[in-house]
Amino acid sequence: MSSFIADKIVMDGLTFDDVLLIPAYSEVLPKTVELKTRFSRHIELNVPFVTAAMDTVTESQMAIAIAREGGIGVIHKNMSIENQAREVAIVKRAENGMIYDPVTIQTGKTVADALAMMAEYHIGGIPVVDEENHLMGIVTNRDLRFERRLDKKIDEVMTHENLVTTHQQTDLTAAAQILQENKIEKLPVVDKAGHLVGLITYKDITKAKDKPMACKDEKGRLRVAAGVGVTFDTLERMQALVTAGADAIVIDTAHGHSKGVIDKLREAKASFPNIDIVVGNIATGEAARMLADNGADAVKVGIGPGSICTTRVVAGVGVPQLSAVYDVYQALQGTDVPLIADGGLRYSGDIVKAIAAGGSCVMIGSLVAGTEESPGDTIIYNGRKFKSYRGMGSLEAMEHGSKDRYFQADTKDVKKLVPEGIAGRVPYKGTVQEVIYQLVGGLRSGMGYCGAATIDKLHEAKFTRITNAGVNESHPHDITITSEAPNYSRPND
């Protein structure tokens, strides 16, 4: 005899508060664990954190901050193609081993031109070149600081005598020595014919020493990804982002297991075979295999777990996050396709669980939305500082460009949009560096308890299912908290 349970219920759905990791024999100290992992098939991370492609989470400032900590940010798409490409370019220029395409100014230009370029690119010096890109000199803000004639030719104020340069084979250690010996901050790199081929700055060398865990490409630039939707101009947007230097493209939709998304994935892989394409969001192993078979370089897992997402309530659809992550992890065995666990993370312990269930890394939104580097508006409420945070399925975000993520791109009337998210505020949390420090600390601690020296070893950890009483027991209880911890707040605070 058939029944609803026998015929319709195909799996138990568990999420973070339903389970705990079982401690195991360990020879691993938290400070010695290895956090290296992968974001996508060809992109490694030094910490398993990815900031979400949300318009109140990740623009260039956030992407720079998370990359310096060892993760990667995904620039959101709720802006014009030009502006999104510019945000990517800002990240790629933020740090360099050697700047391979430095901003230059041609001889004959004026002081006003140089000042405008310095303001636009936030730089303090510009190499001066002729029409054939021969290095003629360098102009810095020191040269221009007291110059009153804005129409004066740059040739008259630039430094050109005794100009210190180096060749392409110079490593950063040797470059640092040259900079120190000559008391200069910028070192032009030229070829044998005197053509400018790059620029090494003292600031970049200092940053590299200060942030040895930073996530960088083979040229020493910070890595960054960028989100796109499934629209008529997706390939045009991708082209602009790739040209700007994006290390990966994330096809970001509410339902990645759909024909339109898979067709766009195929187009993207055909048009950009040398760049990693990440696709999401999904919640089943079947979806993961289909995306992997069609060329996805990573998949993003999570339908409805986010704090600002209402998909499960509005549409009645989703899979509790830990079950979804494990189902996808099992399906991807043998494919070399990493899994990004996206959403539902409130504490560092949730991150440990998400990775133990099969995640290669986690995508974070609310955990960093309250930081200094997030683009959300700062709000003062009842004497406390907050930052705005909204789901990309909220009415406000959909009005600004995320309608296509929820397959409503053709809906012109705002009143006819069906949102799958809300807008709100989160407490101000300080800097990204401070937040990531605590999250990394919690992850290291969890790995130590499980005896897992690496992310891959953490995948072998076992869980125990708990009751509501177990959840209550897990949190501080029978006490009034008088001093807040930087990594804990009560549920629903």
Each language-model region and where it sits:
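Alpha/beta catalytic cores of nucleotide-metabolism and tRNA/nucleoside-modifying enzymes
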Residues: 1-25, 105-106, 167, 227, ...
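Catalytic cores of alpha/beta
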Residues: 61-64, 236-244, 277, 283-301, ...
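Catalytic beta/alpha-barrel core
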Residues: 74-78, 104-105, 125-127, 165-166, ...
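Bateman/CBS regulatory modules and CBS-like beta-alpha motifs in cytosolic regions of diverse proteins
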Residues: 33-45, 52-54, 83-121, 128-130, ...
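Active-site-adjacent beta->alpha loops and helix N-cap segments on the catalytic face
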Residues: 31, 80-89, 147-151, 195-215, ...
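Short beta-strand/loop segments at the ligand-binding rim of alpha/beta enzyme cores
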Residues: 44-51, 97-102, 161, 217-227, ...
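Glycine-rich phosphate-binding active-site loops on the catalytic face of alpha/beta enzymes
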Residues: 68-83, 246-258, 297-315, 345-379
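Short beta->alpha transition motifs characteristic of CBS
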Residues: 75-80, 123, 127, 134-150, ...
